[in-house]
Amino acid sequence: MQILFVASEVGPWSKTGGLGDVAGALPQALAERGNEVAVVTPRHGSIDPRAAGLQPVRTALQVRGEPVSLWVKRGPAPVYFVEHPHLFGNRRGLYGEGGRDHGDNAERFAFLTRAALALPGALGLRPRILHLNDWQCGLGPWLLRHEHARDPALAGARTVFTIHNLAYQGLFPKQVLPALGLPWEVFRWEAMEFFDQLSFMKAGLAFADALTTVSPTYAREILTPEGGASLDALLRHRARDLHGILNGIDVHAWDPARDPHLPAHFTAGDLAGKAACKAALQREVGLPVRPEVPVAGLVTRLAEQKGIDLVAAALPALLARDVQVVLLGSGDPAYQETFARAAREHPDRVAARIGFDEGLAHRIEAGADLFLMPSRFEPCGLNQMYSLRYGTVPVVRAVGGLADTVEDFDGVARGTGFRFSEYTPQALLTATRRALDVFRDRRAWRGLVERGMAEDNSWERSAARYEALYRTLAP
């Protein structure tokens, strides 16, 4: 099956979050299953064509009469980079700079989507599925129906629109409609109007043939007023077309048996290397090397979506136990100072590294005994799956993908982690204390570790589910 996959970021070339991970991995997994997949994304200013190994593409591609240059990264699922010096090439941030969105994001991503829809005709492709991701590509289904209705390259093509995070909706003043080349008739409540603004996210939800999001539980949550970000009524109307498909993880980049970031390697059958990773982590972050003390890890944005307010509130009571805490992250300056101060006040119990370090993120996953993810909401989440693969027991709030990937320990021989439901510091503390109590039972803890490491969270599993959905749309 021919598939055109469109995303505003594609790892490793451009990435601000989970979308970049998905766009970098899912098309490759689909290609490995025998599908013909092409990916379309902007050539952001941070991408050096020469350093990235991109090749120029000779094409007659145009968007609204304007010639468009194109680059390609060859591979099983070739990635086409759309060039536009003003809209993409001269920007530092993908979506904004200095904490503010770029003022022309509507024009930027309308241009990307139009370029993606014009690309099959220019390159001789005949995709049966257009897989469009997040608000940046939300105009795609409408544009396919109204600007490409007679395009032979897209004849019979069906659209899949994936919600990676419903909280980001692509909202713009209605006055941008003429600049986008959209008729005023789309500015209706049953189309793209959203509280007197233009919503790219709503456009995708209203007009795509199928909707997906990144976990089954998140798919249910966004049907409710509490989780639907004011789009729940539309989503309930489209509930039959909404599918929750879990993201996967890159099991090659995240493999404790081969990870180049680790000082020692290990498997479920031989955990000696994990003990060595724990000691090395304690040394690296300046904590006493004490193998008998449980280490709780966090790799996170310091933002309330991630439940960091719960961690901050629960930390004093947690430190009443004999435990060490290692945190890596950045975000809200107030929380940065909270954890930096905790590290200063408890230098033998707390280590806080403000910023991001890919290698240290891997070493925390490998060296910690448990991993805290008390998110307020979490469409999918990746770190809990990394933790399972690295034998690090997750303590999670049972929302979104966390609920779908972590089974609560039953006290005997089932479960892969510890879950809680209420969004309170006490609920987090109770779940963490459960984990610390079980940590002292080496046999029960070993069972938790081994069951977690046996979980299949590969992209192969996710790709099979997407492929099954595609075939219901384009048999």
From Swiss-Prot:
Gene3D superfamilies: Glycogen Phosphorylase B (3.40.50.2000). It catalyses: [(1->4)-alpha-D-glucosyl](n) + ADP-alpha-D-glucose = [(1->4)-alpha-D-glucosyl](n+1) + ADP + H(+). Keywords: Glycogen biosynthesis, Glycosyltransferase, Transferase. Transmembrane segments: none annotated. It holds the Pfam family Glyco_transf_5. GO terms for molecular function: alpha-1,4-glucan glucosyltransferase (ADP-glucose donor) activity; alpha-1,4-glucan glucosyltransferase (UDP-glucose donor) activity. It is an enzyme of class 2 (transferase). CDD domains: GT5_Glycogen_synthase_DULL1-like (cd03791). One of its GO terms (biological process) is glycogen biosynthetic process. Belongs to the glycosyltransferase 1 family. Bacterial/plant glycogen synthase subfamily. Synthesizes alpha-1,4-glucan chains using ADP-glucose. This is Glycogen synthase. It comes from Anaeromyxobacter sp. (strain K).
